[in-house]
Amino acid sequence: MGPEYQDIELASFMSTSKGYMGECGFRGGYCEAINFDPDVRVQLLKSISAKLCSSVSGQAAMDVVVNPPTSSEPSYQLFVKEKEQVLGDLKEKAKMVTETFNSMDRMSCNVVQGAMYAFPQIDMPPAALEEAKKRGVPADVMYCFELLEKTGICVVPGSGFGQRPGTYHFRTTILPPVEKLKEMLERFRIFHEQFLSTYK
C-alpha cells in the first residue's frame, strides 16, 4: 500500500458465503489484522477462540477459496472463466438493481458494491406511517409484508438492521439470474406504485 500507509491498522474479512464464489450455507471465513497492537490481537484471538468454529465442510470450502487453482493446473482456465463470469454477472445485476430502485418514486438506493445485497430507502408517505402505527408495526415491516403478500417477493425490513429512527429501508438480494431479477424488479415496481397510490 506504500510507505505512507505502513503503520495503519487494517482489518480484512473474507467469507465463503459472501465472497465472489457465493457458496451460501458454508459457514467459513477469516479475518486478517495488520498492524494491530499486540494486546488488541490477543483480545481478538480470545474472542474468536471463544466462538464456535466452522463446520468441516465450511473449513474445506475456505481452503478452496484461499487456494484457488494456479496457472499450472488443468482447471485454471475454467476457474478464471467462471470467476470472471460470476463477477461480471454480479456487476451487471448490482447496476440493474441500483438503477431500478433509484428510478422509483420516493425510493433511493446507494450503489451496490462489494455485497450481494441492496438496501434501498423508502421515503414513506405520511398515510403509510399512520397505517403502520394503527397496525402496531414499523412502517418498513408493513411495506415488506404487503410486498410479500401481493407479489411473493421476500425482502427483509431495515428495522432488523438497526436503521436510524425515522428512516425506512429493506434489504434485498441481487443473486437471482438476470432474467429472473428483471422480472422481480418489474413486479416490485408495480407493487411500489400501487403502495404509493394506496397511501397517497
Place the predicted regions along the sequence by residue.
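PLP-dependent class I/II
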Residues: 1-200
